[in-house]
Design a protein with these regions (language model features):
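A shared catalytic/ligand-binding motif for oxyanion handling
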Residues: 1-112
């Protein structure tokens, strides 16, 4: 299972969306956490349909305007359980469906 993090500084731009999609496909990444997305809920819906069809996502958009943390997961390979969602952190349990290996993951974005 491969995991990636990217502080994207604006995931609403098509070039950046394409870059993350290319990285995920080229490196066979099953989970990618994108920080500082600046996405709206509508923008996220469009992104999921266009670039990550069939993937699931967890975000903290409901706790902070401007969408700070977005976790994208391939549900065929990884099970993700969100445990706590706060404005600066998402805590979750990640389980690999192939190996049954499980670990806790915290994705943090600190405000300036």
């Amino acid at each position: 299972m491969k995991v990636a993090f990217w502080n994207i500084r604006g995931f609403h731009l098509p070039l950046k969306q394409k870059g993350v999609e290319a990285l995920v496909r080229k490196r066979d990444i099953g989970l990618v956490a994108v920080l500082e997305t600046k996405l709206t809920v509508n923008g996220l819906d469009a992104l999921m349909k266009r670039r990550f069809k069939g993937w699931m996502q967890v975000n903290n958009f409901g706790t902070h305007a401007g969408g700070r943390i977005l976790i994208l997961v391939d549900p065929m390979r990884i099970q993700l359980e969100a445990l706590v969602i706060l404005p600066q952190v998402i805590h979750c349990r990640v389980t690999c469906k192939v190996s049954s290996c499980s670990f806790l993951l915290s994705c943090v974005y600190g405000f300036n």
